[in-house]
A protein has these predicted regions:
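Helix-loop junctions at membrane interfaces in 12-TM secondary transporters
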Residues: 140-152, 207-210, 417-427
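Hydrophobic core of transmembrane alpha-helices in multi-pass small-molecule transporters
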Residues: 148-163, 424-438
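C-terminal transmembrane helical hairpin of 12-TM major facilitator-type secondary transporters
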Residues: 399-442
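Intracellular cytosolic loops and amphipathic helices of Major Facilitator Superfamily
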Residues: 1-13, 49-76, 231-335, 510-530
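Hydrophobic transmembrane alpha-helices of multi-pass solute transporters/permeases
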Residues: 1-66, 71, 82-129, 160-167, ...
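C-terminal ends and interior cores of transmembrane alpha-helices
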Residues: 129-143, 407-420
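Cytoplasmic helix-loop-helix junction between adjacent transmembrane helices
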Residues: 157-187
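Loop-to-transmembrane helix entry/capping segments in MFS-fold secondary transporters
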Residues: 90, 178-187, 453-463
């Protein structure tokens, strides 16, 4: 397989040495920072009267005695709705969450498009500045008259935050060895849960939303510098375009980071590895197979080479040619079509259920901070456990999903038909949330593995877009559907998702698919369930 040859080529740069662990830690911190709005947003929408009844009474009493009381006002200015005085305007409160999800959806769509024109590292660098600017914009607003700028900043935060997350995940998936791919993906996704714990504690003790935003700005700038000077693009992107010069520069940079640059140059110039490079670079699609698929002529696309040459480094090269196939072209291939459509459905349903359950859990009685922190703690643990389970051979990706779907289906049915004491209800909710987060982690890993390199990023971005649409719809369904009926619907949806998994291939222990041709030649694709 071509992927095995590429992994052998990556190994001479010491790809399994400290560079991949540096990237893992860097992108974990990036995910913690980019997702900081996940725990912060509920607090910004929280009405202070609910949390501080006694202090509200004190505020009213002191207002009767004095025309102003700065300390009390400062105490209550910890959220957007209190600072802008929109406690009674449910429409504006609702817009805060809606515009955030709109930004997330725009980010996944943008990723599916611009990754065909820009390298992943360049996307990371541009998005870092956009993310910093959008956070800064929201922290400079003090007047309700400019509330629209808050909403605009939320859109840009969601857009650039998603671009940072998805680009970093793709880079990590493509540079690490196949036996560590799922584990690394799960650790990076743990950033979402860890950010919930970290920023919730900050919010709980500081109770001023601006501090969380200032921390995110400072951390974003540090991450930008580390990405710019200490990381490299995925070489697969340039291998796909047969750009050997950039591939060498990237691998040489990784070898330099690992302290084995001299050994790398010696091996790279050896006859063995030069032959390996020629085999990788001269690889072409078998046109007979693609014609048999749908009689589509791909020769012009597959044989196109990049004419722009590197001047000094990968940073100064022009973006790769538009060799990646669009998702609409990939729909013409039966081998890709059903995978793409099924994953769109699975992403939509998974995100819809996940966000609705999050809203359901946050509405439970008890200490609000405690519920949020426990919820995100469960999510972090779920990502790690799921990352371990999907590497177990007899479970794999699909087996893990079946087990998790079974657990949450039982949980939904119990909650929809039976009444439990509060501790039991809380426990069932956290178990369901645990499994739902684990399922989402599996799809992050699985989606990138199931597609060949030419369409991997594009189709991944479109699949996540469908998931974000589900996130937008979730609050409306949660608001207008009775809880027992909602849980029953979710139970039926999980059963339907389990049925759809039958038609998808197992990817555990298999190399990443590098071409449409490899996908067409895999007779077991779409039929394996082991």
């Amino acid at each position: 397989m071509r992927d095995q040859k590429i992994e052998k080529l990556l190994s001479i740069a010491g790809n399994e040495n400290r560079y991949q662990y540096f990237v893992l830690i860097l992108f974990l911190i990036l995910w913690i920072n980019c997702n900081f709005m996940a725990p912060v947003l509920p607090y910004l929408e929280r009405e202070p009267i609910v949390e501080h009844n006694n202090e509200i009474k004190t505020l009213f009493f002191e207002i009767c005695q004095n025309s102003t009381n700065y300390k009390i006002i400062q105490r209550f200015g910890y959220s957007w709705i209190s600072e802008f005085g929109i406690e009674c305007n449910k429409f504006k409160i609702g817009l805060i969450g809606v515009f955030t999800f709109i930004g997330n959806t725009m980010g996944s769509i943008a990723f599916a498009i611009i990754q065909r024109y820009l390298s992943h590292k360049r996307i990371l660098l541009i998005s870092s500045w956009g993310f910093i600017f959008s956070i800064y914009l929201s922290t400079t607003i003090y007047n309700i008259e400019y509330f629209i700028y808050i909403l605009i900043s939320l859109v840009f935060m969601g857009l650039f935050g998603d671009l940072l997350c998805y680009s970093s995940l793709v880079v990590c998936e493509e540079i690490v060895s196949s036996n560590k791919r799922a584990l690394f993906s799960s650790i990076i996704n743990m950033g979402y849960g860890l950010c919930g714990i970290i920023f919730s504690f900050i919010f709980m003790y500081v109770q001023n939303w601006r501090y969380d935003f200032y921390i995110a700005i400072g951390l974003s700038f540090i991450l930008y510098l580390l990405i710019k000077f200490c990381t490299y693009d995925s070489p697969r992107q340039y291998i796909d375009n047969k750009d050997e010069k950039n591939v060498k520069i990237i691998l040489q940079g990784i070898a330099r980071f690992n302290g084995i640059e001299k050994e790398f140059l010696e091996k790279y110039e050896s006859e063995e590895y030069q032959k390996l490079i020629r085999e990788i670079m001269e690889y072409d699609y078998d046109e007979s197979n693609t014609k048999n698929e749908n009689e589509i002529e791909m020769k012009d696309i597959d044989n196109k080479k990049i004419d722009d040459q590197l001047i000094n480094s990968v940073e100064k090269t022009k973006p790769p040619e538009k060799k990646s196939l669009s998702c609409f072209m990939s729909l013409k291939y039966p081998s890709l079509r059903y995978k793409f459509l099924i994953l769109c459905i699975l992403w939509f349903g998974t995100r819809l259920i996940s966000n609705a359950i999050a809203l359901y859990s946050k509405a439970l009685p008890g200490n609000y901070y405690f519920n949020i922190i426990v919820l995100f703690t469960f999510e972090s643990f779920a990502y790690y456990v799921s990352g371990v389970l999907i590497n177990v051979h007899f479970l794999g990706r699909k087996g893990t999903l079946y087990v998790e779907y079974l657990i949450i289906t039982i949980g939904f049915l119990l909650l929809s038909f039976l009444k439990f004491p509060l501790p039991v209800e809380l426990s069932l909710n956290f178990i369901i949330r645990f499994c739902e987060s684990a399922i989402e982690l599996v799809y992050f890993t699985y989606t990138l593995e199931v597609y060949p390199t030419p369409v991997r990023s594009t189709n991944f971005g479109i699949n996540v877009t469908f998931g974000n649409i589900g996130s937008i719809i979730a609050p409306m369904i949660y608001e207008y559907v009775q809880s027992w009926m909602l849980l029953l619907i979710f139970a039926l949806m999980t059963l339907f998702h389990s049925f759809l998994l039958i038609f998808l291939p197992e990817t555990e222990g298999k190399p990443m698919v590098e071409s449409i041709d490899e996908l067409c030649n895999d007779k077991n694709n779409g039929k394996d369930s082991n």
